[in-house]
Amino acid sequence: MSHTVKIYD
């Protein structure tokens, strides 16, 4: 998986 910023609300 690519490195991405994951934000969980």
Curated annotation (Swiss-Prot):
It is found in: Cellular thylakoid membrane. One of its GO terms (biological process) is photosynthesis. Binds 2 [4Fe-4S] clusters. Cluster 2 is most probably the spectroscopically characterized electron acceptor FA and cluster 1 is most probably FB. Keywords: 4Fe-4S, Electron transport, Iron, Iron-sulfur, Membrane, Metal-binding, Oxidoreductase, Photosynthesis, Photosystem I, Repeat, Thylakoid, Transport. The keyword Chloroplast does not apply. It comes from the Bacteria. It is a peripheral membrane protein. It catalyses: reduced [plastocyanin] + hnu + oxidized [2Fe-2S]-[ferredoxin] = oxidized [plastocyanin] + reduced [2Fe-2S]-[ferredoxin]. Its cofactor is [4Fe-4S] cluster. Its EC number is 1.97.1.12. GO terms for cellular component: photosystem I; plasma membrane-derived thylakoid membrane. The cyanobacterial PSI reaction center is composed of one copy each of PsaA,B,C,D,E,F,I,J,K,L,M and X, and forms trimeric complexes. Apoprotein for the two 4Fe-4S centers FA and FB of photosystem I (PSI); essential for photochemical activity. FB is the terminal electron acceptor of PSI, donating electrons to ferredoxin. The C-terminus interacts with PsaA/B/D and helps assemble the protein into the PSI complex. Required for binding of PsaD and PsaE to PSI. PSI is a plastocyanin/cytochrome c6-ferredoxin oxidoreductase, converting photonic excitation into a charge separation, which transfers an electron from the donor P700 chlorophyll pair to the spectroscopically characterized acceptors A0, A1, FX, FA and FB in turn. This is Photosystem I iron-sulfur center. The lineage of its organism: Bacteria, Bacillati, Cyanobacteriota, Cyanophyceae, Nostocales.
